[in-house]
Amino acid sequence: MAKQSMKARDVKRVKLAEKFYTKRVELKKIISDVNASDEDRWDAVLKLQTLPRDSSPSRQRNRCRQTGRPHGVLRKFGLSRIKVREAAMRGEIPGLKKASW
């Protein structure tokens, strides 16, 4: 089990990313615009740097919904590989069965 503080930190990052999403997209659009003046682009870079670090979506971590485990998380289920296996063995995931060949 992950610490509660780590889970809370990830929740905070998700909220910040949602809050600053539009502003971040607008600034990145200005920065990548070739027709914009150098001053405008530089101002956009500086404004982007003033945004909170945790507002960047790349700082979010996929975590298991049940345990909070950060590694081995399957996106399709939102669970770690361990919890997916346990649920599959109990027959709780429809259409998922153990491989046999």
From Swiss-Prot:
Protein's UniProt keywords contain Magnesium: no
Keywords recorded for this protein, A-Z: Ribonucleoprotein, Ribosomal protein, RNA-binding, rRNA-binding
MF terms (GO), sorted A to Z: rRNA binding; structural constituent of ribosome
Record field: transmembrane: none
Domain of life: Bacteria
GO cellular component: cytoplasm; small ribosomal subunit
Biological processes, Gene Ontology terms: translation
InterPro entries according to UniProt: Ribosomal_uS14, Ribosomal_uS14_bac/plastid, Ribosomal_uS14_CS
Listed PROSITE patterns: RIBOSOMAL_S14
Family label: Belongs to the universal ribosomal protein uS14 family.
NCBIfam families reported for this sequence: PRK08881.1
Protein function: Binds 16S rRNA, required for the assembly of 30S particles and may also be responsible for determining the conformation of the 16S rRNA at the A site.
Subunit composition and interactions: Part of the 30S ribosomal subunit. Contacts proteins S3 and S10.
Name listed for the protein in its UniProt record: Small ribosomal subunit protein uS14
